Amino acid sequence: HEKEFLSDKAAILSLFGLSVAWFGDNLPPPLRARVLAVQGMIAVGFIAFMLFASNPFARLMPAPADGEGLNPILQDPGLAMHPPMLYLGYVGFSMAFSFAVAALIDGKVDAAWARWVRPWTLAAWIALTLGIGLGSHWAYYTLGWGGWWFWDPVENASLMPWLLGTALLHSAIVVEKRDGLKSWTILLAIMTFAMSLIGTFLVRSGVLTSVHSFAVDPARGLFILGLLVVTIGGSLLLFALRAPALQG
């Protein structure tokens, strides 16, 4: 599960980058180049993590003659779509993050930028909403899982980027319609993706105790923490240096 999780994220990151390359003809070439560069660097980070810390292509030796299979309680159509939708939402917010970093480098946030970033943010928000909803529906009729919402740490880790993504959608509208909240919108774009990475770190590092169970490896947690520090720390430093020029 752990290795599939990483390969799924890397694949989704690559697909989002390809989408911008193929369908981003309406973007100014410098902005599109910077968005693709940021998206590519994030993808490289996850691919490096996958290859060096959790290689999905590593052979299992010795291979079990007869595996145990999936827990029957998890064999549910809705639950089959729950993780992919969450991953699509988490990774989808990387597009808003990439647009935010590109805007900080350009020193320009305007109505056109807001129109470009909103569809990507909305797509990620819808995917995350579906993922949370499918998981909640499954938990409701599964005995002993706590009902619709248990305020479990892993559930809360998915809720935080959803709340920030909701705020980002509304803030982008203000940028587009009133030319205001520019710095706030950029910060929301950064923090929404930051919470996606922080949630991944907390869940996969074993820091949290949860009714959700995952394969835990402290070394992998440290790798994710390093990726988090570089990605989010660098973007927040750039924000501190460039945001004053975006006020308006």
Where would I find each of the regions flagged by the language model?
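Polytopic transmembrane helical bundles with strong interfacial aromatic enrichment
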Residues: 1-248
